[in-house]
Amino acid sequence: MSIAKDNEWNEHDSDHIARTKYNPMEHAMDVEFHNGSVYRYHGVPPIEYTRFLASPSQGYYHADNIKSNYATKRIK
C-alpha cells in the first residue's frame, strides 16, 4: 500500500482510530480518535506510516509501534 496524498485525512475502519493524515516533510502523523481527540506524533518516518496503513489492525499497530515510540502532543 502506498502513502495516501500528503496532508489529506484517511478514514479507517478501526474501533478507536477514526482517521489519520501524514506530513512527509515534517514526519508528522496526526491521529483523530472516535472520541474527537487529535494527537500529532513527531519524527514518524514515511515507511512507518506506510506500514501503519498496510496493517490489518491500525489500532493495534498504533498502540504497539507509534504511541510509545514517537513524541506526541494533543492538538485537539
Locate each region found by the language model.
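Acidic/histidine-enriched, beta-strand-rich ligand/metal-binding domains
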Residues: 1-76
